[in-house]
Amino acid sequence: YQSQIACKGLVSLAFSQSGQSPDLVAPTRFFSEGGAVTAAFVNKADSPLAKAAQWVFPLHAGTEASVAATKSYIAQLVAGARVVAAWQGDQDLQSALTALPDDLARAAQMDWSVALDVLQGVDRLFVIGRGTGMPVALEAALKFKETCGIQAEAFSSAEVKHGPMALI
């Protein structure tokens, strides 16, 4: 820990709902003091993380009423995707992000209750992802733990036969 890192030329992006976590604030401050360019994507623009970073990008997700912080998580994904789309000049991704509010509104109107039949009585859950879906699987597992109180674990679909399947 606390090893020397060559920070010059480094860009550090930190994503947080509250901007309070010392696990994010300390390295952001360390990188910034070491000459890195630091940016914080936060729901609370006056947070310690925002103060530690050189650039602040408010997420504008609104007040979180739940520990799961789903609005902030979606806002973080969108912010990250917007940065990538602009940086890489990815017109397809930019178009998809422009359409996203309407797509999310349609998804919110759908009847998702059929999932209850699948999940009823479940006390353990595997969430599988791969590639860009792996971080989403990790977050989904966390949401199930936080909101349902069940053992939910995320695994890469590329590795699921080498351990998780042995548990079944």
Show which residues each predicted segment covers.
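Glycine-rich phosphate-binding loops that contact phosphosugars or nucleotide phosphates
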Residues: Y1-D102, R130, M165-I168
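Anionic-ligand anchoring segments at beta-strand to alpha-helix junctions in alpha/beta enzyme folds, i.e.
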Residues: Y1-S12, G34, G121-I168
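Residue-level recognition of alpha-helix initiation/capping sites
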Residues: P22, M110, P135-V136
